[in-house]
Amino acid sequence: TVANSTQLFWSVNEPFEDRNGNTLAWTGIVFAIGSLIWLIMIIIPAFDPAVLQAHESGAIDSNEEVKEFVDYLKPKEGFFITPILVYANVGIFLLMFFMGFGFMSFNSKDLIIWGANYGPLTMQGEWWRLATNTFLHGGFMHLAANMYGLLFVGIFLEPLLGRMKYVGIYLLTGIIASAASLWWNDTVVSMGASGAIFGLYGAFIALILTRVFPKEMGAGFLVSMFIFVGFNLVMGLIGNGIDNAAHIGGLVSGFLIGLALYPSLKGTFKMDGVNEKEESVDEDE
């Protein structure tokens, strides 16, 4: 038997940072894990003495490396969608900032108004929140960590998939991740691109395991992916304010999509990162 009881619910509009603990500590953790990933990417590939000699002799200008990084933020053939997604996420964040909603953190009430995923509203017909919340972030560090992860995976994955497949995976897995978050806890205000980014990482892992990428590249990529994914999932288990349901939903759906795409992508990847098969398709899009 179940006794009748009265339950009272009330909304909590606390700043997003209050659910994330020590912001300074999280800042250090984010950059530490990012540095570790890049270190692994450097150590595992074969060492090239010629490149080292060129650096030591001054033949390679150090400023060129900075210019190369900035160039990654410019839409171009083979890498068009990722910068656009970064601009969209950063643009919305800056708009909220200049309108006075905050910087390091935003209030949950304001995030709901801007389109965050909130069960009582989403399930009453505002299904568009499953998509719009993926372009909102709870604060600066939330945005910075996600954009770092997006650029890292986009550099390698977008040239292989092409524009339509890439943006399709991003949007679809982002919506699935939002639905997973809603299913797990429909009273939480959730937002962020991490579900969609985990979807891209899931697809990336699937293509690494199916040997779409050359063997000499796969080892470094795979270790980096597992460190990034594992770290975030563990932090979601031991910390507050991390939506592991969205992360897992995006990761699993992305992995399955990657497996489904494998037959059409097998043997199309070149070492310079340009996909010949998809290059011709992109020109028609």
What feature does the model see in each segment?
Residues A3-D284:
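A detector for small-residue-rich transmembrane helices and their helix-helix packing motifs
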